């Protein structure tokens, strides 16, 4: 029960962070491209690499905290469903280059950031 409560609490924090951070990004850059979703997914990709590698290489994070941060906070922060919907809407609106850019940037940059999170922890070891 402790783990489930931790996940729920962290998920709420991640969801609120996504709401405010993506809203702020859209306020800065506009909504012509799904910048807000891309930014939160990039941040989440880096952080999950960092947290998982830290959890595997040290005792700094308890299993409950690691699960709360990854399943809860990162699960609430990042969103594949919004990425899918926004990409579909770009395609539907005939914005093929923007849709392709979103897919390429989301996949490539998020994979790169996950790797950077892992490398960050490994460089500290």
From Swiss-Prot:
Q: How does it sit in the membrane?
A: Multi-pass membrane protein
What GO biological process terms are annotated to this protein in UniProt? cellular detoxification of fluoride
Q: Which GO terms describe its molecular function?
A: fluoride channel activity; metal ion binding
Q: What activity regulation does UniProt give?
A: Na(+) is not transported, but it plays an essential structural role and its presence is essential for fluoride channel function.
- Using the chain's own numbering, where are the disulfide bonds? none
Gene Ontology cellular component annotations, sorted alphabetically: plasma membrane
* Localization in the cell: Cell inner membrane
At the top level of its lineage, which domain of life is listed?
Bacteria
Q: Is Transmembrane one of the keywords UniProt gives this record?
A: yes
**Which reaction is the catalytic activity of this chain?**
fluoride(in) = fluoride(out)
Q: Which UniProt keywords apply?
A: Cell inner membrane, Cell membrane, Ion channel, Ion transport, Membrane, Metal-binding, Sodium, Transmembrane, Transmembrane helix, Transport
Q: What Pfam families is this protein classified in? A: CRCB
| Major localization class | membrane
Q: Where does Na(+) bind?
A: 75, 78
**Which regions span the lipid bilayer?**
9-29, 32-52, 67-87, 99-119
Q: Which InterPro entries match?
A: FluC
- Keyword Cell membrane assigned to the entry: answer is yes
Recorded family membership: Belongs to the fluoride channel Fluc/FEX (TC 1.A.43) family.
The role this protein plays is: Fluoride-specific ion channel. Important for reducing fluoride concentration in the cell, thus reducing its toxicity.
Protein name per UniProt: Fluoride-specific ion channel FluC
Source organism (scientific name): Trichlorobacter lovleyi (strain ATCC BAA-1151 / DSM 17278 / SZ)
* Gene, per the UniProt record: fluC
């Amino acid at each position: 029960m402790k783990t489930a409560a931790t996940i729920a609490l962290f998920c709420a924090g991640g969801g609120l962070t996504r709401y405010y951070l993506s809203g702020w990004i859209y306020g800065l850059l506009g909504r012509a491209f799904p910048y807000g979703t891309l930014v939160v997914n990039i941040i989440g990709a880096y952080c999950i690499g960092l947290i998982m590698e830290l959890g595997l290489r040290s005792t700094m994070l308890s299993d409950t905290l690691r699960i709360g941060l990854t399943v809860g906070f990162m699960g609430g922060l990042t969103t594949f469903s919004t990425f899918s919907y926004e990409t579909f809407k770009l395609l539907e609106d005939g914005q093929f280059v923007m849709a392709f850019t979103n897919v390429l940037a989301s996949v490539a940059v998020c994979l790169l950031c996950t790797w950077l999170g892992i490398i960050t922890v490994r460089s500290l070891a």
